[in-house]
């Protein structure tokens, strides 16, 4: 029983028991073996008892001593393969340059020399005689004859050059080629500049372990030696040995042990069996074979890279040299051909230039410079290699090294400015670059031409073989190959026909027609204007590249021809329409610029601006008994800020009405963009003006103070509209006496800054039994007006007028009905501020017939549409029509007034006012029995009361 309990406890406490046992063992080991390990001589254990660790660490920290394991050996092999490839290519290009010198043999060619000799023999005497004759003529004719002394000297020089030109050119050739060879090949490395660059930046540890490590060791403290220019090289390899060597080889400890067994081996060779590690607080070394961090040491033992190299220096240097050699080949070949041409041209120049000798000197200089190109190009390449090796010796910043290499490469391609300045020889390789790019472009063009010819041949072969030209896309799927196979084939044929030449011809015809019509309608100036403003779109189209597949069906060809004609006509119509649109746009831009300039200069435009004849502009016609004006929808965008203060006063007087206005002030800043389109037509006996809804965006702040008094108004119509930004001050003074006449309104408009002042005083004097006076006052931001006018004159008619205004909407209907058999007088004065549109409408009708007058004006939120139509029937059947149109930024209003006299009529007017919307309905009916001419003096005269007040 006890045994079972012990076993049960053991299994339940198994985890805790194991942890306790491990803790006890750890404590025992730490207290027992730690002092022993601390007192242990690790240097003796690692075999470093007799080794100067500091010297070994300093030697192994050299940049040329690079430790590599299995992966490091692979990376070194990749770098070596890249360097070998570049060296092989650059060496091949470098070997082409001496081969280009073989083209100098053309100067010794028998054919070229025979050709030059034949030219000299055939032309020498003839040209020489002609030159002598010409000199004689010039001596006789010219005021200053040629200098015969210089002519004689030039003849002697000519004879010497003709006889010794070949020998002179041969000597120049030999000197230039020898100079190039001596500058590009040093006394130590005869394999060229490319191999010299690689040799100076590559080391061989096996070679250095025999000869000494001085070439890679620092000569000064804290100055690592990357390259050495001493007599001892870093390696003893030639170019062939380097190309065959395994650049990923690693020097293992076994190899070092074999080397150290030999005599006269440097002591530093023994250090290569160690690698750098640390003992916890400082760097130390350990033997490579004893390293526990190399799991592949049995199969791939670690060691030091045998062929360490400056990969970046060699890579960029070989790349720059390869580009330079490639361009140099083109430069040398072109220079040799130019020298050969100068050899042919030189004798002709010598004979014809015996007067001054300037051209002879020029030819000799050009030949001399041509040969100097070879010599100085070699010098330029050699200096480049020396500077690259110098940069490799210095321990400089990586960024500065890259900048220096880029500058050196650019200088190598552009050439030395010093050589160009002092010798006049351009040793740059820009011409070679241009020739190379031209050759590449020509090769690409030839390749494209070959492909195009192949496509043409393939298409012609398909056409001649009677093939339908069906493509993979046109082939029906297997699931679609059912009973409708025949219809599918017919659809495929139609598709192929459309994709063939028919569609191409139609497209070409359409584009051609559009281009011709556009050019004919716009002209050269219009086309240039469209191109400058980027308005016109590209009309012409190039014929698409590709295959032209024609099915050969006669019906398809016929349809294609017909379609081509129709497409050409359609293109003409499109071109004409496009030209008209561009012309209209140009006209609108011109008008807009003129209005803007006038507004900036403070010039007020005329009251009746001219509008271009457009099919969308309204036209109003008159008839004797019928008149109706309808306005189509107008849209605009406005941003308005308003502050209005209005105060109106009115009083009731006797039979004669007198209207006096007090000044009203307001400040407005308006920016308008309006697009107006109005149409008008005439209808029955009564005129009705209806405005459709107008939309806009406004931001308005209004402060209004209104006080209105009702009275009588006379009938006289006059409307004046200005631009959007108009400043007017209008003074109207009408005087009507009781002798039975009708007063005239005199209005004067002046522009202010941003203020609107309006005084409206209405008094009604009626011989009937009723008179209505209504005062409407509005607060700062809300306008509410109720106007009720009832007049009973000689009959049973009643007139009602209700004016109601909301907070943000203004609607005004004014209905005035006057039956007057006496004389009335009406005075109205309206003054406007600087940027506000001021409108004066004065209507006077003296009618003895049965006419009726009705006028309705409604305006939307941001767009005002007003049609003004005045018809007067006076003692007969005459009709008067008055239309006022505004400019580009001006509000247009149409007012229709008809007078009905001696009858019974009823007038109803609703006026509603809001802050941001103005809607006005005006209906005026007057029954007048007497007609008199206006006695108001014309504006501008000395008797005019308004002008007199203004002068004061």
Swiss-Prot record:
Top-level taxon of origin: Bacteria
Keywords: Cell membrane, Membrane, Plasmid, Transmembrane, Transmembrane helix
Residue ranges of the TM segments: 17-37, 86-106, 117-137, 150-170, 314-334, 336-356, 371-391, 396-416
Residues covered by region (Disordered): 461-504, 617-636, 677-696, 932-952
Keyword Membrane recorded: yes
Principal cellular location given in the protein's record: membrane
Cellular component, GO annotation: plasma membrane
Subcellular location: Cell membrane
Polar residues compositional bias, start-end: 617-628, 677-688
Compositional bias per record (Basic and acidic residues), positions renumbered to this chain: 471-488
Entry membrane topology: Multi-pass membrane protein
Protein name, UniProt field: Uncharacterized protein pXO2-14/BXB0013/GBAA_pXO2_0013
Lineage: Bacteria, Bacillati, Bacillota, Bacilli, Bacillales
């Amino acid at each position: 029983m006890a045994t079972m309990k012990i076993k049960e406890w053991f299994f339940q406490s198994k985890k805790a028991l194991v942890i306790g046992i491990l803790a006890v063992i750890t404590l025992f080991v730490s207290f027992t073996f730690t002092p022993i390990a601390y007192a242990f001589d690790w240097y003796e254990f690692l075999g470093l008892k007799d080794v100067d660790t500091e010297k070994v660490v300093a030697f192994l920290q050299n940049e040329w001593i690079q430790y590599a394991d299995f992966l490091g050996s692979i990376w070194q092999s990749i770098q070596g393969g890249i360097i070998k490839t570049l060296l092989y290519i650059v060496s091949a290009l470098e070997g082409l340059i001496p081969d280009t010198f073989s083209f100098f043999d053309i100067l010794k060619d028998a054919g070229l020399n025979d050709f030059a000799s034949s030219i000299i023999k055939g032309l020498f005497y003839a040209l020489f005689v002609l030159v002598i004759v010409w000199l004689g003529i010039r001596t006789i004719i010219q005021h200053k004859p040629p200098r015969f002394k210089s002519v004689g000297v030039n003849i002697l020089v000519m004879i010497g050059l003709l006889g010794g030109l070949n020998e002179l050119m041969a000597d120049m050739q030999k000197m230039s080629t020898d100079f190039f060879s001596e500058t590009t090949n040093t006394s130590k490395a005869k394999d060229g500049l490319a191999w010299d660059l690689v040799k100076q930046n590559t080391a061989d540890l096996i070679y250095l372990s025999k000869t000494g490590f001085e070439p890679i060791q620092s000569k000064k403290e804290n100055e690592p030696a990357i390259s050495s220019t001493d007599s001892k090289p870093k390696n003893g390899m030639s170019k062939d040995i380097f190309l065959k060597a395994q650049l990923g080889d690693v020097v293992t400890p076994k190899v070092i042990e074999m080397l150290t067994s030999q005599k006269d081996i440097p002591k530093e060779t023994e250090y290569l069996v160690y690698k750098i590690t640390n003992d916890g607080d400082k760097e130390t070394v350990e033997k490579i074979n004893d390293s526990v961090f190399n799991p592949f040491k049995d199969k791939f033992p670690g060691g030091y890279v045998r062929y360490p190299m400056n990969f970046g220096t060699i890579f960029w240097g070989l790349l720059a040299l390869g580009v330079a050699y490639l361009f140099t080949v083109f430069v040398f070949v072109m220079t040799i051909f130019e020298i050969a041409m100068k050899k042919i041209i030189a004798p002709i120049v010598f004979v014809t230039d015996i007067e001054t000798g300037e051209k002879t000197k020029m030819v000799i200089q050009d030949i001399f410079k041509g040969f100097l190109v070879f010599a100085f190009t070699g010098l330029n390449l050699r200096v480049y290699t020396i500077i690259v090796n110098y940069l490799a010796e210095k321990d400089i910043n990586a960024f500065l090294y890259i900048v220096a290499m880029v500058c050196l490469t650019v200088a190598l391609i552009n050439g030395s400015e010093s050589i160009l300045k002092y010798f006049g020889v351009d040793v740059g390789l820009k011409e070679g670059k241009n020739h190379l790019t031209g050759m590449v472009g020509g090769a690409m063009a030839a390749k494209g031409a070959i492909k195009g010819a192949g496509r043409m041949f393939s298409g012609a072969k398909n056409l001649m073989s009677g093939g339908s030209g069906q493509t993979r896309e046109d082939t029906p799927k297997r699931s679609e190959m059912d009973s409708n196979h025949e219809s599918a084939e017919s659809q495929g044929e139609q598709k192929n026909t459309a994709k063939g030449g028919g569609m191409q011809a139609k497209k070409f015809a359409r584009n051609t027609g559009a281009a011709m019509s556009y050019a004919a309608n716009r002209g050269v100036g219009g086309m240039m204007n469209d191109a400058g403003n980027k308005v016109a779109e590209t009309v012409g189209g190039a014929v698409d590249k590709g295959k032209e597949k024609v099915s050969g069906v006669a019906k398809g060809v016929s349809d294609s021809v017909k379609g081509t004609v129709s497409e050409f006509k359609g293109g003409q119509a499109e071109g004409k329409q496009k030209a008209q649109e561009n012309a209209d746009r140009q006209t609108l831009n011109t008008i807009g610029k003129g209005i803007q300039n006038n507004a900036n200069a403070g010039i007020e435009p005329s009251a009746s601006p001219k509008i271009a004849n457009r099919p969308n502009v309204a036209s109003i016609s008159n008839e004797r008994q019928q008149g109706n004006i309808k306005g189509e929808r107008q849209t605009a965008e406005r941003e308005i800020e308003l502050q209005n203060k209005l105060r109106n006063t009115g009083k009731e007087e006797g039979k004669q009405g007198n209207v006096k206005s007090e000044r009203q002030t307001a400040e407005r800043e308006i920016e308008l963009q309006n697009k107006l389109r109005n149409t008008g037509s005439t209808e029955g006996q009564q005129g009705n003006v209806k405005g459709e809804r107008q939309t806009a965006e406004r931001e308005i702040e209004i402060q209004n103070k209104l006080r209105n008094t009702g009275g009588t108004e006379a009938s006289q119509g006059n409307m004046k509209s200005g631009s959007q930004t108009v400043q007017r001050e209008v003074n109207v003074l009408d005087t009507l006496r009781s002798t039975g006449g009708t007063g005239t309104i005199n209005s004067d408009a002046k522009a202010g800054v941003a203020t609107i002042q309006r005084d409206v005083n209405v008094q009604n004097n009626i011989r009937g039994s009723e008179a209505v006076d209504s005062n409407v006052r509005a607060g700062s931001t809300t306008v509410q007006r109720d106007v009720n006018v009832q007049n009973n004159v000689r009959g049973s008619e009643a007139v009602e007028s209700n004016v109601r205004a909301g907070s943000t909407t203004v609607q005004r209907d004014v209905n005035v009905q006057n039956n007057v058999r006496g004389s009335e007088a009406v005075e109205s004065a309206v003054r406007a501020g600087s940027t506000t549109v001021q409108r004066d409408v004065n209507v006077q009708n003296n009618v003895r017939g049965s006419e009726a007058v009705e006028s309705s004006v409604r305006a939307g939120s941001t767009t005002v549409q007003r049609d003004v139509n005045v018809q007067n029937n006076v003692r007969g059947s005459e009709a008067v029509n008055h239309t006022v149109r505004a400019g580009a930024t001006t509000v247009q209003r149409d007012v229709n007034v008809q007078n009905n006299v001696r009858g019974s009529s009823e007038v109803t007017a609703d006026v509603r006012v809001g802050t941001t919307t103005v809607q006005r309905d005006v209906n005026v009916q007057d029954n007048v029995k007497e007609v008199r001419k206006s006695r108001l003096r014309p504006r501008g005269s000395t008797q005019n009361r308004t002008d007199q007040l203004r002068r004061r």
